């Protein structure tokens, strides 16, 4: 209806480039991503925190200490050690195996906000991913390259595993994305934007699919629409 589809930008939500730092961002500043692309950039502090967390991960790998999801299997296979030569394949297999969603795609606005929320998580500096993983999220947002993500099938045990796996597929150049008003293979959209897909390294597949970014994006959309309804009710009551 008109009440829930009218532009949230008319509620005086801020526009322009959104800075992603280690600080939290209010839902009012995030809701405009539901309506269309907004440029983003990482703060110097966020970039540094991402670099430092990646250094910690590299040190762990050098010590050969067994760390779950980094150099072990997952779930019941958590005690199984994975050799260094197989770490990349482990992360790739994780993403592919969890890309099992079904049904109609998520709304583009929800997908866009989902990417922003994942970027915000990385900006905190706790994930261990390489800076290029976070930068690809920035570039995909700024080119509005949005992975096609089925809305059903999330496991929910460790967050929104299935939908986030579909997001990760777009980042590795697999699956389809929405780009320039068309649905194309992810590799084509990346190539046309002069971007390269990432090759997942230790822990990166796990860090991409673990999280509640889809649930939070849907929650923000519900909150924004409730705000519109509340303001509309206030106006109607004043007539």
Feature roles, as predicted:
Residues 9-12:
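Intrinsic-disorder-associated, low-complexity terminal segments enriched in Asp/Asn/His/Tyr and depleted
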Residues 15-239:
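Conserved, well-structured ligand/cofactor-binding cores
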């Amino acid at each position: 209806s008109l009440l829930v589809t009218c532009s949230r930008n008319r509620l005086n939500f801020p526009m322009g480039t959104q800075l992603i730092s280690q600080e939290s961002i209010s839902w009012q500043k995030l809701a405009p991503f539901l309506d269309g692309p907004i440029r983003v950039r990482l703060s110097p502090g966020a970039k540094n925190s991402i670099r430092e967390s990646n250094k910690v991960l590299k040190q762990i790998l050098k010590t050969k200490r067994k760390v779950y999801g980094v150099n072990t299997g997952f779930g019941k296979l958590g005690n199984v050690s994975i050799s260094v030569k197989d770490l990349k394949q482990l992360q790739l297999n994780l993403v592919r195996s969890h890309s099992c969603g079904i049904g109609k795609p998520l709304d583009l606005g929800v997908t866009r906000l989902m990417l922003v929320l994942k970027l915000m998580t990385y900006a905190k500096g706790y994930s261990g991913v390489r800076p290029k993983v976070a930068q690809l999220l920035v570039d995909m947002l700024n080119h509005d390259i949005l992975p096609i993500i089925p809305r059903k099938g999330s496991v929910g045990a460790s967050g929104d595993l299935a939908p986030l796996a579909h997001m990760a597929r777009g980042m590795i150049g697999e699956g389809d994305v929405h780009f320039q008003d068309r649905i194309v293979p992810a590799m084509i959209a990346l190539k046309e934007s002069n971007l390269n897909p990432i090759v997942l390294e230790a822990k990166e597949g796990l860090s991409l699919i673990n999280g509640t970014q889809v649930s939070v994006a849907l929650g923000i959309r519900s909150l924004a629409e409730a705000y519109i309804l509340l303001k509309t009710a206030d106006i109607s009551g004043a007539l």
